[in-house]
């Protein structure tokens, strides 16, 4: 158990700028979680696609994080975190607006492009916002401060899920019921137009809301100016070499790759797993996912509080170990069925596998900010470039869900969705093993490495 500290987590004079940045965390949570269920929804909009092909949504979304992270670091290096945040928000807005022309083209690929642009903005935004939060106060409270800001992320996630449930999935199911065999091509096309308009609208409206946030940040004169050395005197090559000497940082990048892959895979295939287990519609499966995200949100606040008493690395190792056990429960617990209750919904069927799937989100709640905070320790002037490496590791969210989607197709796909989805959760299980290993490593090595100069 670590000693408690009275050091301020967020200085009072920058509380409003902190709230503005925390709102950014909520807004990328909204997009992330509004997007995950669409992997399955697009199977019905474009029935010619396979599960692995619709998983290209996540490939485009999280692949953009990899491609745009370095440009995000360059912006931070040359112009500072504030302008980096504004650049990221601007591209995020552009991506949301692109959903309108994509909906007119009646093809899957324009949506992939819109997702890529939107997520590219998120990559630049996260590359700047995460280290910006870390730099907003004392280094000894940096991980707790980042966990506090990240606690707003699941608030946006919940909003995204409710939007997806009521503004997308429920409406899509009404349209899907109109589709029958033998319909004329023109009738099918008209319904497809209606389906794509339903998908487009929430993203387009979110982009309009983000314009207001962009203006508030751009015009706020109290946003702190963070100086980590003269950008003109900092050699990128030597900084990269320095980062490659930091074993803790390199392990954090690897852990981040596997953790993000696990999170996106778990949440993306929640709908495949639950609908396959229970034989229900996507909008009904959303009720279980909402429980998971509520617990994810509450648990992130809980873990942030526990960090006053336990080292973040200890909590990371513990949560990762429990996540491994939960993954085993998801794989093998699908046949243990019982009746349960969902608040505000009513009686609902459950399996032990579904319970374990929900509890996995509790374990994941602290992982991203904790890995990011621990990995950023002792980087000094290398923090900006180091942050881009940690954000690039989000590439795991593009590759590992694609692997899990291919496993579902191999194990039976749509014809055996329940068992196929259950077996595919071996992918997150392996990822949590890596996160556990990093938690143990960080626990026994902190904080011994020298700060960069």
Task: Give the role of each language-model region.
Residues 68-81, 299-312, 337-339, 408:
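Helix-to-loop junctions at the C-terminal end of transmembrane segments
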Residues 35-39, 160-171, 241-290:
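Extracytoplasmic gate region of multi-pass secondary transporters
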Residues 107-125, 258, 341-367:
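Hydrophobic core of transmembrane alpha-helices in multi-pass small-molecule transporters
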Residues 56-74, 290-303, 396:
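Central cavity-lining transmembrane alpha-helices of secondary-active solute carriers
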Residues 16-44, 129-130, 266-274, 400:
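Extracytoplasmic
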Residues 29, 90-105, 322-346:
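C-terminal ends and interior cores of transmembrane alpha-helices
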Residues 1-28, 241:
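Cytosolic juxtamembrane N-terminal segment immediately preceding the first transmembrane helix
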Residues 67-109:
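Conserved MFS/SLC helix-loop-helix module at the cytosolic interface between two early adjacent transmembrane helices
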């Amino acid at each position: 158990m670590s000693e408690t500290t009275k050091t301020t987590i967020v200085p009072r004079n920058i509380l409003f700028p902190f709230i503005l940045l925390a709102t950014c965390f909520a807004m990328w949570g909204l997009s992330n979680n509004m997007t995950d269920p669409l992997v399955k929804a697009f199977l019905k909009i474009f029935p010619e696609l396979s599960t692995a092909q619709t998983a290209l949504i996540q490939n485009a979304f999280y692949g953009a994080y990899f491609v745009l992270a370095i440009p995000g670091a360059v912006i931070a290096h040359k112009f500072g975190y504030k302008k980096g945040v504004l650049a990221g928000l601007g591209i995020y807005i552009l991506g949301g607006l692109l959903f309108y022309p994509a909906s007119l083209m009646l093809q899957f690929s324009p949506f992939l492009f819109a997702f890529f642009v939107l997520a590219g903005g998120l990559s630049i935004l996260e590359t700047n916002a995460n280290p910006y939060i870390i730099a907003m106060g004392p280094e000894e409270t940096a991980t707790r401060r980042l966990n506090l800001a990240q606690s707003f992320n699941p608030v946006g996630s919940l909003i995204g899920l409710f939007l997806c449930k009521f503004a997308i999935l429920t409406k899509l199911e009404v349209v899907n019921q109109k589709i029958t065999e033998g319909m004329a091509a023109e009738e099918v096309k008209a319904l497809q137009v209606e389906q794509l308009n339903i998908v487009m609208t929430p993203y387009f409206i979110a982009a309009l809301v983000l314009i207001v946030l962009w203006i508030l940040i751009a015009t706020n004169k109290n946003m702190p100016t963070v100086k980590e050395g003269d950008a003109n005197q900092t050699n990128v090559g030597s900084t990269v070499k320095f980062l490659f000497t930091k074993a803790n940082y390199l392990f954090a990048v690897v852990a981040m790759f596997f953790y993000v892959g696990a999170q996106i895979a778990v949440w993306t295939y929640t709908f495949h797993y639950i609908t396959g287990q229970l034989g229900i519609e996507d909008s009904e499966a959303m009720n279980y996912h909402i429980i998971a995200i509520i617990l994810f949100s509450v648990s992130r606040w809980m873990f942030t509080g526990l960090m006053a008493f336990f080292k973040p690395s200890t909590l990371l190792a513990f949560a990762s170990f429990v996540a491994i056990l939960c993954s085993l429960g998801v794989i093998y617990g699908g046949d243990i069925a019982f009746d349960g209750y969902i608040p505000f919904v009513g009686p609902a069927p459950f399996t032990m596998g579904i319970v374990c799937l929900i509890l996995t989100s509790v374990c994941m709640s602290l992982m991203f900010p904790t890995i990011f905070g621990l990995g950023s320790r002792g980087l000094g002037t290398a923090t900006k470039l180091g942050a881009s490496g940690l954000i690039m590791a989000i590439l795991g969210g593009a590759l590992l869900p694609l692997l899990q989607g291919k496993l579902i197709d191999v194990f039976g796909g749509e014809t055996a969705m329940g068992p196929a989805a259950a077996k595919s959760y071996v992918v997150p299980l392996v990822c949590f093993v890596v996160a556990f290993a990093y938690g143990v490593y960080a626990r026994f090595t902190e904080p011994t490495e020298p700060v960069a100069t």
